[in-house]
Curated annotation (Swiss-Prot):
It comes from Sarcophaga bullata. Residues 1-43 form the Chitin-binding type R&R domain. One of its GO terms (molecular function) is structural constituent of cuticle. It comes from the Eukaryota. InterPro entries: Insect_cuticle. Keywords: Cuticle. This is Larval cuticle protein SC1. Component of the cuticle of the larva of flesh fly.
Length: 43
């Protein structure tokens, strides 16, 4: 996990039985809205 001083965070979770990597990252916009992205890297 990584979090920067300006509020960006990133987490990568190890592969599953198919070798896919799961993770998420996010930040807070200038307007104060939280943005969170969750992904599966499968290729």
């Amino acid at each position: 996990a990584l979090e920067t001083s300006n509020g960006i965070h990133f987490v990568a979770i190890g592969g599953d039985e198919h070798g896919n990597i799961h993770g998420n990252f996010g930040w807070v916009t200038i307007e104060g809205e939280a943005v969170d992205i969750t992904y599966v890297a499968d290729e």
